[in-house]
Amino acid sequence: MATNEQFKIKLEKGKAGEYAVIQALSQITEVKDLTNYDDFKGYQQKGLDFEFLNRKTNTWDRGDAKANIMESGLTFMELYKANGKLGWFNTTKSDWIFCYSVYTKSIYYYSINEMRGYIDNRLKDRSIKTSHLKSGDIGVWLPVDKNPLIEKFA
């Protein structure tokens, strides 16, 4: 289990990621910040940190910011929580996941629906394996700079 100190560090990293992603998106499109838990509890519980105007489709898409890129450039897709319940990768209602690296200050993004299909297919054909974290969470690690579905935010 994570200690209280580890949880605080993770929370601060997450807030830094949310801020960086929302600021970067705000430079190119309209963004609705949904990160205030008290004001947007329902959105937050669905894994939504913001909505943004997708300039390609001219629709409002939902986004979730993660600050879970390791120094090695790998990002973690949480399939199951330690308690056996589905992890954020399976439960988020977001359209897009934005990953922020606290090490490089880079932002990467991917379509959650496309990535779910990709992960499902790779698990079925055994070309990737699940990892069990010390926390008890189960998921897969993917390199942000080599995966065909993950794009770097300019």
What are the language-model segments listed below?
Residues 25, 50-71:
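Conserved catalytic cores of phosphodiester-cleaving nucleases, focusing on short active-site segments
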Residues 1-27:
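Interdomain/boundary linker segments immediately adjacent to catalytic/signaling cores
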Residues 4-11, 29-36, 65-108:
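Catalytic cores of nucleic-acid endonucleases
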Residues 51-53, 66, 80, 139, ...:
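Intrinsically disordered, low-complexity regions of eukaryotic proteins
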